[in-house]
Amino acid sequence: MPLAPRVAVVIPCRNDAVYLDACLSALAAQTHQADVVIVVDNASTDASTAVARAHDAVVVHEPSIGIWPAAARGYDEALDRADIIARLDADSRPHPDWIAKLVRAFVSDPALGVLTGGAEFYGGTPLQNYLGEHWYIGGGHYWIKKWLGIPLVFGSNFAMRARVWERVREHVDRDNARIHDDLDLTIRLRRSDGVRYDPQLRMPVSARPVQTVSGLSRRVFKVASTFAVSWPEGAAWRRTQPSAGSASSDEWAPGGDDWAPRYGR
């Protein structure tokens, strides 16, 4: 990989034009610019495609509705365009140094294959934002790490080397819109992929997923569905143990209706 790796940012989007406009504006304000921003139009009927093009993003279309089909389509598009594939969602609001942190991390550590971070919820009540950050996302990180032995890849805030996606792209259940795309990806990863969680890599995201009991419950129950379709690969006892010479730790710190606008991701 060159010293300055090429970075592609992938954004799956379905009928989220207003959020997408703010997200793309935040990407335009990055201290380190992406080489390409890829917006995957997932059969939108609003102005999402027009918004993406107004920001000079590359627009690709995925007619199969669902986050996993859309995200996978974007990762495929990025394979020949980038060394690092970064991912966020239309309602993400990346801090100005988000891409710079990603690039610094991957350049400084060749063993790093996937880097993910946490969330800062906006738009909800203080209680909703707190529960979203510490119970929904924080709890997911805690329990998935204990079960799988690697950090949970958070779909609204992560990046991976292109070679990692090239290895797993035919193994993930990419056409299944009824499972968590990021959890399914996590299940297909191994310690040897160099998966790390950086607690300082935080992403403002909409509180829409935690603003209704039904929306939150649906997402929690999808965890079971995701493990079910991947079984037994997601079984804790089948996970590869780290070798004695493994150089990576799990943390790095720098010196469907899933698209329903009411609920968000």
Task: Indicate where each model-derived feature is located.
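Short, well-formed alpha-helical segments that are part of the catalytic scaffolds
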Residues: N15-A29
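Acidic helix N-cap motif at the loop->helix transition within catalytic regions
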Residues: V18-D21, D46-A54
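A conserved acidic beta->alpha catalytic loop
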Residues: A26, Q33, D41-T49, S92
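Glycine-rich, basic loop-to-helix element that forms the pyrophosphate-binding segment
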Residues: E62-D80
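Short beta-strand-to-loop acidic/aromatic patch adjacent to the donor-nucleotide binding site
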Residues: R81-R93
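Conserved donor NDP-sugar-binding/catalytic core segment of glycosyltransferases
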Residues: D97-L127
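Short, flexible, basic/aromatic active-site loop/helix in glycosyltransferases
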Residues: G117-F121, L131-P151
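Acidic donor-binding loop at a coil-to-helix junction in glycosyltransferase catalytic cores
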Residues: N176-L185
